[in-house]
Amino acid sequence: MKFDVVIIGGGLAGLTCGIMLQQKGKCCAIINNGQSAMNFSSGSMDLLSQLPNGEKINSFEQGYDSLEEQLPNHPYCLFGKQHVLQKAKQFEQLIEKINLNVTGSYKQNHFRVTPLGGLHRTWLSADCIPTMDLHDEHFGYQKITVLGIEGYHDFQPHLLAENLIQHPQFTHCSITTALLHLPELDQLRLTSREFRSVNISQLLEHRLAFRELVQEIKQASGDGEAIFLPACFGLDNQDFFNKLTLETGLNLYELPTLPPSLVGLRQHKKLKTYFEKLGGFILNGDKALRAVIEDQQVKQIYTQLHQEHGIFAEHFVLASGSFFSNGLVSVFDRLLEPIFDVDMIGNSMIDIQNRLTWTARRFSSPQPYQSAGVAINSCCQLKKSGQIIKNLYAAGNVIGGYNALELGCGSGVAVVTALTVADNIIEAQNRV
């Protein structure tokens, strides 16, 4: 098989890059091994939430200079402020076209309510999630009802309510909790392993008398002005939840549950469907194993399902994710990228070849290994033994030099690098 571009990884970075390339007339294939991190995500995307010194960030433009000073190896610092802002704006335009149902702007972060009742700075959020402006002194409603589902332990209304009321923006609120019984779920309640958001959503969409669900939500909501629900209403898209909102006449909001996250699943499905609609190929259930590199170029790769006959392409994109997705792995004496074994980078706290530096003593502290990843140049090209591989690029969390969890920038790095890679591939092919 031969394509213009082969992308390893079907997450946010891989799909974003693939969509942009398909729009420019390139023939792309995505090698997708299992679920992406989007299926476990909150439904929100971060551009930059805080600096390495712990300072919270209201806007990327405000925080960039300090980021460049404190962490010059961050991928953003390779591109420059204006390039990152341009790509963030471009991504917003892309997802508006796809109708991803998100709110927010690269110009300023906003708060989203977390499932545990926290307030998290973020860039873009699904429009079904409760959010508020950073400068709002009070949440927009005074009476909030948090509804759980009887027997469902992946969403805890009481815990959310007790934590939420601690924030100054919610001290004026009256927050009550209640449980929905939903008799149609009794079969799932018999097996706790099956009582998960995906299973609940499937049953509610296909077996439930919709009117009874509407009435139970209205009754349990009492005099609540804003109703917070676990994200269990609508598996493939937001239509079922939107219909619930319309029929109840209430201000309904969804909060992501413990994985799998339906909000993230919906976003991933929309991106994937759009990529395929543009003519892209997805090789599901396959895994890239090794590559043939000659004259500083990748000639072909072999996968689990294509071990005898390689997959050829003009350009290759590594968007396989970090340790969570097995895009990076560890052996006893070093951290490495397993397919191409390219050069790695971390931050000042870690030595890639000294495992004693990989972790911090406190479990809750930022872990140094999370900053490890592949080293790139300003074109997102990779290096092997110090030599640039001309047709191999990286996008997303496989890139090192920063801690996405600590800084709140994982999604931002994914889309900025993905769009940068797409531009560079198009430019390279136009030169030929």
From Swiss-Prot:
Cofactor entry: FMN
GO annotation terms (biological process): glycerol catabolic process
Catalytic activity: a quinone + sn-glycerol 3-phosphate = dihydroxyacetone phosphate + a quinol
Pathway the protein takes part in: Polyol metabolism; glycerol degradation via glycerol kinase pathway; glycerone phosphate from sn-glycerol 3-phosphate (anaerobic route): step 1/1
EC number(s) recorded for this UniProt protein: 1.1.5.3
InterPro entries: FAD-dep_OxRdtase_2_FAD-bd (IPR003953), FAD-oxidoreductase_2 (IPR050315), FAD/NAD-bd_sf (IPR036188), G3P_DH_GlpB_su (IPR009158)
GO cellular component: glycerol-3-phosphate dehydrogenase (FAD) complex
Alphabetized Pfam families for the sequence: FAD_binding_2
GO molecular function, one term: glycerol-3-phosphate dehydrogenase (quinone) activity
Keyword annotations from UniProtKB, A to Z: Flavoprotein, FMN, Oxidoreductase
Family annotation (HAMAP family): Glycerol3P_GlpB
Subunit structure comment from the entry: Composed of a catalytic GlpA/B dimer and of membrane bound GlpC.
NCBIfam families tied to this protein: glycerol3P_GlpB, PRK05329.1-1, PRK05329.1-2, PRK05329.1-3, PRK05329.1-4
Function according to Swiss-Prot or TrEMBL: Conversion of glycerol 3-phosphate to dihydroxyacetone. Uses fumarate or nitrate as electron acceptor.
Name this polypeptide is given: Anaerobic glycerol-3-phosphate dehydrogenase subunit B
Lineage: Bacteria, Pseudomonadati, Pseudomonadota, Gammaproteobacteria, Pasteurellales
